[in-house]
Amino acid sequence: MKINIFFISFSVLVLASCSNAIDADELYGRWDYIAVENFNPPDSLTKEELIAQAPAILFSKDNKLVIEWGGKQLSHGTYKMDGKMIRYTEFLEGGGKREFPFLIKELGEKDLVFQTMEQNYTRVKAKKR
């Protein structure tokens, strides 16, 4: 009986962990930022600042990622999904690269919440256009 309970519990945990993975297809498109919060030190952009800067993140089917800010491309590179992590490789001027992850906290059909993985993390809420 104990063995059956163990296998049932183990199976439930495995299935639950698999359902947390996010498919890149769910991200494709343009996501306009509606809130940007920095947690240490506490700070956030006002609604007026967001309207003026019009920040967005764009995911394409060829695994390219672009971040726009102020009507211009702020950052670009490639990404791959790893569970709930967006593994972003940013292409820098001069041919360099920088890798960093974003953690997806929430994802719906039109809503996305993600954050950086630094100690002084930033959380972004976005709406799909």
Give the role of each language-model region.
Residues 4-16:
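Sec-dependent N-terminal signal peptides
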Residues 17-76, 82-129:
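Lipid interaction determinants
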